[in-house]
Design a protein with these regions (language model features):
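Membrane-embedded transmembrane helical bundles of large multi-pass transporters/channels
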Residues: 1-35, 206, 213-311
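Solvent-exposed, non-transmembrane loop/terminal regulatory segments of multi-pass membrane proteins
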Residues: 25-68, 177-184
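Soluble or luminal CAZymes and related metallo-dependent hydrolases
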Residues: 42, 71, 210
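Extracytoplasmic/secreted envelope proteins and their assembly/folding machinery
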Residues: 47, 51, 72-76, 215, ...
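A short beta-strand structural signal in non-transmembrane regions
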Residues: 57-66, 126, 134-142, 184-238, ...
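Short acidic amphipathic segments
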Residues: 75-91, 228
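Conserved hydrophobic/aromatic pocket- or pore-lining residues that grip, position, or stack substrates
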Residues: 79, 198, 278
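Extracytoplasmic
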Residues: 86-197, 240
């Protein structure tokens, strides 16, 4: 009995130490739909059924400074070459019709054909547009050498129509108004005063190495044309949570242990009992969360936070 009594503390400390090491080696899932979760959530089950029918498709939003449609088009073209990318949507690749892109630049003669407006009026429009934007090529040079993005031109024409500067017949006015509604909707979705949004889709798993490599490649491609960019997606969220979770969790655990020790010391007015109680409490937490590692399962990080808070 005496020998067993002497051995028990060492066994207790050894178990706690092993639990602490194994729990730190546990693999956490940061996306609720992760396939590796032992007990899927209702959301993940529903999503899995949808994916089985329609296929998996995740979105990646790339935020870049607005105002340069040519650079945006180059970014879209370059990123689409990535094998993990399925599709891209931005103003620079949105079609106006079968022959034109919204951000494509056209001259006065092409505008006359596209909008069915008198050519001389189109020339005046281009000269007025150039003057308002401090671009005088249309005034002092050949007006047909001056080109304007379709989306900007139509916005300008609609603005002048509202001010009564331009008078068109009823059919032309209706066509311009209908097109303006479509352009406004596209700009609201994909462009603000300072930034443009390009939306890509990809099919690799959210927390896979393939997805994380794809994010690195996309950022590298975008930074070839822009000094600043933001990437937003479920994969970005999972990667950022994974990068910060370990360090933050260790800091919180340390602060919790120190705070608990301090409270127990004031309560029991001794050093031995608080240390023993903290070891018992924190040891049980470590032992509990070492089980997923031993069973080879991933633990959803929110479940870990909730359970560890309760314990």
């Amino acid at each position: 009995v005496i020998k067993l009594k002497n051995i028990v503390p060492y066994i207790f400390i050894a178990i706690i130490a092993v639990g602490a090491v194994l729990s730190s080696m546990s693999n956490y899932a940061f996306d609720a739909t992760a396939e590796q979760l032992k007990k899927p959530t209702e959301n993940s089950i529903a999503k899995r059924k949808v994916d089985e029918i329609f296929g998996t498709d995740h979105q990646l939003a790339v935020i870049v400074p607005s105002g340069d449609y040519d650079r945006e088009a180059k970014v879209i073209s370059l990123v689409e070459e990535n094998p993990s990318i399925n599709s891209a949507l931005g103003l620079a690749n949105t079609e106006l019709d079968d022959d034109h892109i919204l951000t494509e630049k056209i001259n006065a003669r092409e505008t006359s054909k596209l909008m069915n407006i008198d050519y001389d009026l189109c020339c005046l429009l281009f000269q007025a547009y150039g003057a308002e934007h401090d671009e005088y090529n249309a005034i002092f040079g050949d007006v047909n050498d001056y080109e304007v993005p379709i989306i900007d031109l139509f916005m300008y024409v609609h603005e002048k129509m509202d001010l009564g500067v331009i008078n068109l017949d009823e059919d032309q006015t209706n066509d311009i108004n209908d097109l303006y509604d479509k352009l406004t909707d596209a700009k609201d979705q994909l462009e603000s005063d300072n930034y443009s949004r390009i939306i890509f889709t990809y099919k690799c798993d959210i927390e896979s190495d393939e997805a994380y490599q794809m994010l690195k490649d996309v950022r590298s491609d975008v930074e070839k044309y822009y000094d600043e960019c933001l990437l937003v997606s479920d994969s970005v969220n999972s990667r950022d949570l994974g990068d910060s979770f370990g360090g933050d969790n260790n800091k919180i655990n340390l602060i919790t242990i120190l705070a608990l020790l301090l409270i127990l010391m004031f309560t029991f007015r001794s050093a031995g009992v608080p240390v023993l109680l903290v070891l018992a409490i924190q040891g049980s937490v470590w032992i509990n969360f070492s089980i997923p590692f031993l069973t080879g399962q991933r633990l959803y990080f929110l479940a870990y936070l909730v359970v560890s808070s309760i314990q």
